[in-house]
């Protein structure tokens, strides 16, 4: 399939493992190819969805894997429509047993962490489609995930019902593009499209010249329909808001009111530290909720540019956040949302990645749905250089599964209190960020 392929033909996702009930393909099978299987290509994260995407766009990606030497940059910017980048992915869970088992979690729902990886992979494919100039003599752009806007799970995603992801470019700046993805699953016949949407996500990618690493201009976008124009305007407003927030954050200082809030937060923490026998048993120190995970980033986890791709980091952060909420609550947690994520520093193959998590605070005003707010900080550590830098900070919100909560009468989620001013500041900054949304 080349770039001119119609976006109306969805890409079907299939399992990456051969079924034990099927024999090997025959020699004359039209699905066989002299080209090496996509699963053997180096420098790629492999999942059913990324395999499908790479097979569908192999001409583009083969050029990215082996770009022309000393090729000139793209000389002319094209104008494209959202429909030209629109891509649809189908997960045939109802008929593909192997695929279903690859995505099943212990509660018979789709693994959210694995889905996050697929969303990032699809967003990357869409960004490449939009930025391609259809000229094999020019060098391709380096496209990296810059940030992910808030991702909210609107309803549970079953692993037994077919799933669809649709994505397209909805906005472009000079060197950045925004891709909107919608995950849909129809659980009732006759339901409308809006009710079918289980999750939506907006990814922002930035373009760099693959030779100079400087910001590079991207193809223009021309919205056609009223809905596309509305999405473009909304994305433009979000871009302006992000710029304002960055400026506000640089100027932000704690005033007298903030100092009072700090002292209120720290009051109970001091009781825990100085008189633990008298501390509130319905509370717990933030430091006692911490979890940690470490790993060496392997070549198999890299993207086409040789860096660890953002979806892998999202998946790892989600798994640690889920475990942190599980250990804290004592009941199986239920994922609700991920707040805005900035990918501040690239992660390279061979990096020593440390993920540190904690329960930052809880919201207990609704006893039927207590909220557990988890912070996960990713540190890129280089022992030989004695350096450690923050790559990403993730914020996840969980509650507890109703069916799990029903098994414990009188169950309560504990309040989390800080022991240091630094912890209190982190809590206040997070609360204020949530209040501004």
UniProtKB/Swiss-Prot annotation:
Stretches assigned to the HotDog ACOT-type domain: 89-211, 287-404
Presequence range in chain numbering: 1-13
GO biological process, alphabetically ordered: acyl-CoA metabolic process
EC number of the protein: 3.1.2.-
Sample GO molecular function, one term: fatty acyl-CoA hydrolase activity
Domain of life: Eukaryota
Transmembrane segments: none
Gene3D superfamilies (UniProt xref): Hotdog Thioesterase
Cysteines paired by S-S bonds: none
Predominant location category: plastid
Location(s), subcellular: Plastid, Chloroplast
Tissue expression per record: Mostly expressed at low levels in glandular trichomes (lupulin glands), and, to a lower extent, in stems, leaves, flowers and cones.
UniProt cross-references to CDD domains, sorted A to Z: BFIT_BACH (cd03442)
Gene Ontology CC entries for this record: chloroplast
UniProt KW keywords: Chloroplast, Hydrolase, Plastid, Repeat, Transit peptide
PROSITE patterns: HOTDOG_ACOT
Function: Acyl-CoA thioesterases are a group of enzymes that catalyze the hydrolysis of acyl-CoAs to the free fatty acid and coenzyme A (CoASH), providing the potential to regulate intracellular levels of acyl-CoAs, free fatty acids and CoASH.
Stated family: Belongs to the acyl coenzyme A hydrolase family.
Protein name: Acyl-coenzyme A thioesterase 2, chloroplastic
Naturally occurring in which organism (per UniProt): Humulus lupulus
This protein's encoding gene: TE2
């Amino acid at each position: 399939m080349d770039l001119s392929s119609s976006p109306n033909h969805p890409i079907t996702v299939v399992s990456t493992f051969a079924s034990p009930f099927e024999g090997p393909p025959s020699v004359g099978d039209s699905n066989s190819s002299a080209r090496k299987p996509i699963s053997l290509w180096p420098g790629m994260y492999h999942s059913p969805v990324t395999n499908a995407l790479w097979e569908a766009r192999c001409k583009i990606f083969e050029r990215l894997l082996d770009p022309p030497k000393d090729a000139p940059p793209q000389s002319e910017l094209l104008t494209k429509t959202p429909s030209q980048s629109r891509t649809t992915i189908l997960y045939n869970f109802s008929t593909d047993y192997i695929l279903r088992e690859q995505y099943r979690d212990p509660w018979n729902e789709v693994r959210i962490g694995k889905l996050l990886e697929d969303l990032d992979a699809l967003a990357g494919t869409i960004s490449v489609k939009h930025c391609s100039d259809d000229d094999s003599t020019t060098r391709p752009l380096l496209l990296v995930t810059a940030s992910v806007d808030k991702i909210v799970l609107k309803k549970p995603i079953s692993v037994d019902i077919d799933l669809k992801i649709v994505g397209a470019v909805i906005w472009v700046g000079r060197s950045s593009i925004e891709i909107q993805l919608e995950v849909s699953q129809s659980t009732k016949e006759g339901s409308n499209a809006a009710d079918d949407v289980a999750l939506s996500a907006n990814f922002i990618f930035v373009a760099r010249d693959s030779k100079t690493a400087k910001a590079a201009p991207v193809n223009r976008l021309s919205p056609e329909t009223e809905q596309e124009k509305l999405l473009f305007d909304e994305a433009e407003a979000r871009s302006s808001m992000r710029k304002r927030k960055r400026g506000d954050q640089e100027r932000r200082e704690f005033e007298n009111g903030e100092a009072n809030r700090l002292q209120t937060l720290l009051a109970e923490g001091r009781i825990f530290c100085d008189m633990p026998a008298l501390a509130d048993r319905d509370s717990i120190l933030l430091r006692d909720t911490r979890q940690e995970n470490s790993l060496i980033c392997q070549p198999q986890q890299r993207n086409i540019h040789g860096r660890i791709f953002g979806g892998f980091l999202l998946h790892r952060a989600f798994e640690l956040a889920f475990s942190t909420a599980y250990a804290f609550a004592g009941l199986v947690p239920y994922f609700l949302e991920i707040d805005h994520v900035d990918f501040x520093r690239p992660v390279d193959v061979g990096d020593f990645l440390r993920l540190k998590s904690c329960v930052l605070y809880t919201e207990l005003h609704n006893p039927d749905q207590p909220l557990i707010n988890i912070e996960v900080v990713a540190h890129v550590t280089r022992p030989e250089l004695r350096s450690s830098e923050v790559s990403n900070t993730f914020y996840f919100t969980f509650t507890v599964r109703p069916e799990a909560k029903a098994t414990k009468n009188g169950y309560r989620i504990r309040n989390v209190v800080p022991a240091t001013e630094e912890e209190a500041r982190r809590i206040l900054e997070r609360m204020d960020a949530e209040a501004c949304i």
